From Swiss-Prot:
Ranges of compositional bias, category Low complexity: 130-144
Source taxonomy: Eukaryota, Amoebozoa, Evosea, Eumycetozoa, Dictyostelia
Keyword Coiled coil in record: yes
UniProtKB keywords: Coiled coil
Coiled coil residues, start to end: 405-455
Chain residue ranges for the region called Disordered: 104-144, 397-456
Protein's name according to its UniProt entry: Uncharacterized protein DDB_G0286423
Biased composition (Basic and acidic residues): 405-443
């Protein structure tokens, strides 16, 4: 973006925001949107005022919230993002949203008064309230030493503001550099989670929100879980128990099923589901998910053909657990705001929401979603690696041809003595280039070993199909007496079988 506003324009917009009439806030927001589209970004003073309004009771007016978030999204589209590392604001947003969703029928929610701060104080601002509701043990306050401690009070942001701000933060982190296997030191999430147990606290709030939110919010929260987990090697093993415990604490079984279905397919979903299954029904020491489907062949590689045998190991424990776990019939339309989306749900093709869902149904859905995610991930990896191999070979051939042509042209124009000297120099350069290429290949091999990658191999789909088909029969036979929705189980298993049958067909 170009630059900040002038001082006079900044003062004008600030006065509009501070006016008692909400209409003036709308006017200021429209002016900011126009200026952001022209490449100008607001100074820190105006940014603070907008956030303060969203935290205050003035955000009960939907027009105010809509226009301010429109400004923030406009700035985000231009590459300017605000409040990415304000942990107090971020955790307050998710805690507040959790409070509102967990008590939607409350006729008079507790009122809070947010303490105001001057312009320069927001960077280190502690969000405080004079009176606030009692929160869960995951509520956070930050001590003077920077260590996370449990607190009973935190700023309670109005419902609409907390919802749109949560969506705003999720969209920002999604749009940033999230495609690598691990966050860099400059990534805001990396810096946020370096302090104390912040990642665990945030995950606890997110999983609690999933138990009460509407369909659109559940989709966003499911996406957010995979986005944070994409941080990878820096904290994935330590954070997985927190996610698994939060998943277990979700009261309604159909909410667990929806969470599994709404997570976007990919490596993160595969690791999460595999880790949660191992957490609930460990096949050994309980740490098998750390080395999930690893194959030593100069490195590591996920093998789909090893997935079904692993299912067999955990199925016995899972079915015993499900048969002993009492669970009341889960009805779909008993939760906050879910009826608004009952007619346009494209993500629950295998989920009969009008029928009861129990523990065994959730177990089968987790397995089927894990298998589908693994299939999609492996297919993408195989295609990308094969494509890269072909491209690398073509580039090498082109480089050889061009070097030969250049050498021939130069040989015709230059004397033999000069050619001999140049050829020697070229040979030396080629040897140096070969050494560099060998070093790069070694680095790539080491990177592949670290990331669980290998040269592409063709999955034995026929073997996998036969294994899973046999496993499906076993599941249907053993869980017949304890399942609540046999149709749901059959449809999910048949869905995976159909995919594998298609893959195994020559």
């Amino acid at each position: 973006m170009n630059s900040e506003f002038s001082v006079g324009l900044s003062n004008t917009i600030s006065s509009l925001f501070k006016d008692d009439e909400d209409y003036q806030i709308v006017q200021a927001s429209e002016l900011l949107t126009y200026l952001s589209n022209k490449g100008f970004y607001p100074p820190l003073v105006i940014q603070n005022i907008m956030i303060d309004i969203l935290e205050s009771e003035r955000s009960n007016d939907p027009a105010v919230v809509y226009n301010i978030i429109k400004v923030l999204n406009s700035l985000k589209d231009e590459g300017y993002r605000i409040e990415l590392e304000n942990w107090d604001l971020i955790i307050s947003v998710f805690i507040s949203l959790n409070i509102h969703l967990s008590r939607p029928n409350s006729s008079s929610p507790p009122t809070t008064t947010t303490t105001t701060t001057t312009t320069g104080e927001r960077a280190g601002k502690k969000l405080k309230t004079e009176s606030s509701p009692t929160l869960s043990s995951s509520s956070l306050a930050t001590s003077s030493r920077g260590v996370n401690t449990v607190s009973d009070s935190v700023a309670k942001i109005p419902f609409l503001s907390s919802k749109v701000l949560a969506t705003y933060f999720i969209s920002i982190y999604e749009s940033m550099n999230m495609v690598t296997s691990s966050f860099t030191d400059s990534h805001p999430l990396h810096r946020l989670f370096k302090v104390g147990n912040r990642a665990h606290i945030l995950f606890s709030e997110v999983m609690s929100i999933i138990d009460n939110c509407d369909h659109d919010t559940l989709r966003e929260m499911s996406k957010f879980v995979t986005l944070i987990y994409r941080g990878g090697k820096s904290w994935e093993d330590s954070i997985l128990p927190s996610i698994s415990q939060g998943f277990r604490n979700i009261k309604r079984c159909y909410r667990r099923a929806l969470f599994c279905q709404l997570m976007p397919f990919g490596d993160e979903k595969t690791k999460l589901l595999k880790g949660m299954l191992e957490y609930f029904y460990p096949t050994g020491s309980g740490n098998e998910f750390v080395g999930f489907n690893k194959r030593k062949r100069g490195g590591t590689k996920e093998l789909i053909e090893e997935l079904t045998p692993w299912f067999k190991k955990i199925s016995t424990k899972a079915i015993k657990h499900c048969s002993k776990t009492p669970s009341s019939d889960d009805q779909f339309y008993d939760s906050y705001n879910y009826h608004d989306n009952q007619n346009d749900d494209n993500d629950t093709n295998y989920l009969n929401l009008e029928s009861p869902i129990g523990e065994i149904e959730v177990f089968v859905i987790m397995i089927c979603q894990l298998f589908q995610s693994t299939i999609i991930s492996s297919t993408k990896q195989y295609g990308l690696k094969l494509k890269n191999q072909v491209q690398n070979k073509q580039q090498q051939q082109q480089q050889k041809l061009t070097s030969i042509i250049k050498d021939e042209d130069k040989n015709e124009k230059e004397n033999k003595s000069e050619n001999e000297e140049k050829e020697k120099e070229k040979e030396k350069e080629k040897e140096k280039e070969k050494e560099k290429e060998k070093e790069k290949e070694k680095e790539n091999e080491e990177g592949e070993e670290d990331n669980g990658d290998q040269l592409p191999y063709q999955v034995p789909w026929q073997t996998v199909y036969e294994q899973f088909k046999e496993f499906s029969k076993t599941i249907l036979t053993t869980c017949e007496k304890i399942c609540k929705n046999r149709t749901l189980i059959e449809s999910n298993l048949n869905g995976v079988e159909t995919i594998l049958k298609f893959k195994s067909t020559p």
